[in-house]
């Protein structure tokens, strides 16, 4: 394993940057829920997150340049940027999954903010644990790949047949969900922003808790693909953790941008569903067909771009005529 550049000074600096960006993110995300310009605010938030990551990378470059040499500073500067951009690109399917889960369980925008608030911190904990202890710890949970992919494939097909993700798919009354609600004492009723509530004197979990667990499982499962990809760039835990953390925090804003775009456009709803079906098939065939991570990310980006182009140049022209 390579020697790490993570000195106490850099780790402390990272902690300060992390606290600052979390405060900024939480403040902005609290505003967007109650504003009509959610899309624009999310764009600002995404830009701030990216600029903060770049500023931190510049700090790394300056520190290494004056404590070691310019060559090592340049190498680590480019490595951090590469890891950050790679994590962002590989998280597209993760963000799409968030939207799909929120739609399936009819989670309001206010409740989405609560779930993503706690989900972000849990994702940071899980991600750092995976990096430190290795992906092999998740090998005994490999069955989750297939459970999640079957659910994705099933709900994706139903969504297409029911005319897009904008139409609510009644997952609450399916056999699988009814069994989960009964087995794990989960109520179908929301209780403000609470993850747990009391019914008939018994403490039960709310749908918010169920969706939070599903989102965290989703993040753990997809991180098995993304983290090894970052290890191909560098094995320095400091670079891996810092670039991953900055990327994860910025995903909330990316989700808001995606969610608002889907609400405004018609075709992209089918594009997201197609992406989720592709992800499920990719997971199911993982043992037989090895689809490269970058190829998968390229496919997802192409689908989204194609949907926007079709929406802009076909449906808008058609509506004018």
UniProtKB/Swiss-Prot annotation:
Gene Ontology CC terms: plasma membrane
InterPro entries recorded: Integral_membrane_TerC
Major location category of this protein: membrane
Similarity comment text for this entry: Belongs to the TerC family.
Compartment list: Cell membrane
Annotated source species: Buchnera aphidicola subsp. Baizongia pistaciae (strain Bp)
Alphabetically ordered keywords of this record: Cell membrane, Membrane, Transmembrane, Transmembrane helix
Topology of this chain in the membrane: Multi-pass membrane protein
Source lineage: Bacteria, Pseudomonadati, Pseudomonadota, Gammaproteobacteria, Enterobacterales
Annotated protein name in UniProt: Uncharacterized membrane protein bbp_156
Keyword Chloroplast recorded: no
One Pfam family from the record: TerC
């Amino acid at each position: 394993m390579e020697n790490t550049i993570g000195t106490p000074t850099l780790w402390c600096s990272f902690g300060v940057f992390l606290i600052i960006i979390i405060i900024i993110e939480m403040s902005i995300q609290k505003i967007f829920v109650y504003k009509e310009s959610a899309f624009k605010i999310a764009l600002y938030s995404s830009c701030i997150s990216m600029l903060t990551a770049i500023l931190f990378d510049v700090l790394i470059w300056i520190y290494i340049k004056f404590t070691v040499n310019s060559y090592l500073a340049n190498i680590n500067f480019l490595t951090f940027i590469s890891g950050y951009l790679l994590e962002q690109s590989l998280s597209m399917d993760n963000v799409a999954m968030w939207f799909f889960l929120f739609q399936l369980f009819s989670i309001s925008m206010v409740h989405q903010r609560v779930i993503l608030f706690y989900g972000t911190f849990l994702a940071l904990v899980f991600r750092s644990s995976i990096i430190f202890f290795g992906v092999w710890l998740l090998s005994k949970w490999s069955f989750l790949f297939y459970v999640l992919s079957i659910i994705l494939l099933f709900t994706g097909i139903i969504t297409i047949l029911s005319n897009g993700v904008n139409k609510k798919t009644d997952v609450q009354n399916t056999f699988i969900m009814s069994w989960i609600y009964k087995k794990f004492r989960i109520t179908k009723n929301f209780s403000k922003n609470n993850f747990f509530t009391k019914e008939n004197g018994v403490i039960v979990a709310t749908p918010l808790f169920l969706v939070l667990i599903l989102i965290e499982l989703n993040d753990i499962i997809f991180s098995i693909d993304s983290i090894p990809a970052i290890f191909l760039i560098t094995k320095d835990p400091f670079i891996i953790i810092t670039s991953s953390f900055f990327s994860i925090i910025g995903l909330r804003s990316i989700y808001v941008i995606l969610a608002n775009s889907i609400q405004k456009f018609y075709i992209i709803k089918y594009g997201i569903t197609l992406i989720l079906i592709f992800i499920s098939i990719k997971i199911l065939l993982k043992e037989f067909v090895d689809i490269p991570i970058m190829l998968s990310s390229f496919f997802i980006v192409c689908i989204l771009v194609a949907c926007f182009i079709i929406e802009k140049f076909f449906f808008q022209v058609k509506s004018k005529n």
